[in-house]
C-alpha cells in the first residue's frame, strides 16, 4: 500500500516528495519484531487549504553547508566515504578523551543562535517583567480554562502510568537506541576547526566567562547598561566573598553603580545571601558527603569525589516499580532482551545520516517509527509543522533541520552516559543526583517516548494550539544549548517527607516561636531570585500540564528549566506529607505573558542570575532550590470555596504541606529566604489572605525568612504587611496565629479580607489574644 498523508494538502511539496522517496526504499518500511499498534487519526488537526511556500534557505551556519557538500562527495566516491568514516572515528575518540560526557561530539559549534535572528527591537528587563505581572493579575480565568483539561489529563495519565508498570506487560517508556561510534558521517572539517577555536577561547577567557555572558545577553536583548552593571556588581561581590566576607563588604560599599529597578533592589538581597552561604558553610540537601549512599544515589562523576556505590535494588513484584524503564538498552532490568532495540537503533542512525537532504518529513517519519504508528499513514503533527514553518522563515530551513538532529544526537547518548539502573524515588529511596548532560539525555528520550506513556512529548507535537508551538521553542532552545555549550554540573532531585507523629513533635517545639521576618516585593518575580528556596505551586503530579496545554506557574518554571522534567520520571504522585525538592536546575529561557498568552523569550539577565558558575557548590550544583508543594483544589462559588478552606482539617493539611516543604533544608538555613507568592490561589481557587497566613506559619516552623512576591497586587500586599506588623506589635506567636485562623468561624457571604478582618478583631481584644495562647493540636489531619 502506498503511503498517504493525512490533511497535508495538495499539491505535494518538495519535502513530501523527498519523504516519499525515503519511505519507499529506506528504513521506514522495515517492520519491527514486536506487534505494531494501529492508532486512529488525530481529530484535532486542521486541513491545510493551500500548499505552503517552502521558506528560502539562509546561510546561517557555514559549517552546515560544508557538511552537505562533503556528504554529497562521499556518496559519489566510495574511497572518500571510507576516508570520512575513518576520520570521524578518530575525531570521536579524540573528543571522548577530552570530555567523556560531552553531548556535542557530532554537533557543530557556532556563536550564532536562534536569538540572533529574532527581532532587533530591545526588550528591557523591567518592560518584560512588568508585562508578566500585568497579565498575571487577571490570570485566574486562564488558570481555570487549562485546569479542567489538566485534571482530566492527570487522571488519565495516572491510570496509564499504572498500566505501563503492570507486571504482565513489557515496561514501556523509552525506545532503545545505542550510540554508534563507527559511522559519524555528519562531522565535518569545519566543525573540527570550530571546536578547536572554541577550546582556545575557553582557555584564554576562563577568568572572564560570566562577564562575557552578561555582555552577550546585553547585545542580544537590548538590556540597559544600568541593569547589566547591577548584575556585574553581583558577580564581583560573589567572587570577592569567596575570599573574605569583610573584603566583600568593603568592595560593595566602594562599587556603587547606577543600577535601576529590580536589579538594584535585588542586588542587596543577593549580597546578603552570598554572605549567609559563605559564612555559614551551607550545603543544600542532599549533602552527598553525609547522606546514606544506599538511599541517596549519585549517578554522575564529580571531580575529587569517589564513585558512588549504592546498593543494588530489584523491583518489588507487588509494589510500585522502583527501576526506571530504559528502553534504549538491549536488555531490561531483569536481563531480558528487548526485541525492539536494534530496530530503533537503525531508525535513529539512518535519520542522522541523511536528515540534511530529506527535509522536515524525515523527522516526522522518525517520530512515527519511534511511536510505532501505522506504517501506511502519516499522522499530522500541527504544532511541529507550525514551528518548522515559523522558524524556517527566521533562521533558515537548514538550521531548523539541525535543531531536530540535535535532539536525536542527545537521545543517542543515553546508553553511553546513563547508568544501567536509575531508581525512582519510592520506598526508602530519597534522592537522585544526575549531571546536566544526563538530564538532557532523559528529556531527549521523552521526544521519542510512545504516545501511551504519560511522559511523552507526543501530545505537544500533535496539538493544534499555539501554546504548544511556544513550548517547542522552549524545548528546542534547551537542546540547542545542551548541544553547543552544555553547562558542567549536577542537579539533585529529592523527596522530602515526614510522618504525622514527627510533625506533631516539631509543632510542639516551635509553636511558641515569634512570627518570621516577612518582606514584600511588588515587582520582583520568584524566578528573578537566586541563592534561595523558590516555591513551585505544584500539581500533585509533578510538572502539572507541562506536557499538555498547561501554561501557568509550574508549567512555566519547567519550560524555563526543562531538566526539571526528569523529576516527573522519578517521582510518584505526591502524598499529603510529602514535597519534592530540586536543587541546581539551570535556566535556559525567559518568557512573557501568562496562561494562553505565554510566549517564549531569549534568556534575560534577571533570570540568568542563578546560572552563575560561582554559585555552584562542591558537588557542581547551582545554589538554588525549587520546592514543589501542591495545594488543595477547591470548587464551587467563591463563598463555597472560602467556607471549605476555613474547615480546620483543610487548614491543618495546607499548613503541614507548606511546612514540610519549607523545612526541606534543615535548621541551618535561618538566613536563607523562602521566595513565594499566592500559592494555590489561581486555578485552585485559594483564599489569598488565608494562604498568606498559612505560609507565614510554615516559614516560622522552618525558622526561615519569607520573601513574598505579590505579582502586581500592591494593595493586597499592603494589607498583608499591615496585619503582620500589628501581630508583631502584639507579640503573636505561631501557635496563637494558628489558633486565630482555626477559630474564625464561617462567613455568611464572600468577603476577600474576611480572614484579616477576623484576625484584626482578635488583636483588638487583649483578652482574646491571651486566651488563644493555648493553641490546639495539629494532629487531627
Curated annotation (Swiss-Prot):
Changing residue 594 to A: Reduced poly(ADP-ribose) glycohydrolase activity in vitro. Residues 28-87, 102-131, 206-232 are annotated as: Disordered. One of its GO terms (cellular component) is nucleus. One of its GO terms (molecular function) is poly(ADP-ribose) glycohydrolase activity. Disruption phenotype: RNAi-mediated knockdown results in increased sensitivity to gamma irradiation. Keywords: DNA damage, Hydrolase, Nucleus. It is found in: Nucleus. Residues 106-121 have a biased composition (Basic and acidic residues). GO terms for biological process: ATP generation from poly-ADP-D-ribose; carbohydrate metabolic process; DNA damage response; nucleotide-sugar metabolic process; regulation of DNA repair; response to gamma radiation. Its EC number is 3.2.1.143. It catalyses: [(1''->2')-ADP-alpha-D-ribose](n) + H2O = [(1''->2')-ADP-alpha-D-ribose](n-1) + ADP-D-ribose. This is Poly(ADP-ribose) glycohydrolase 1.
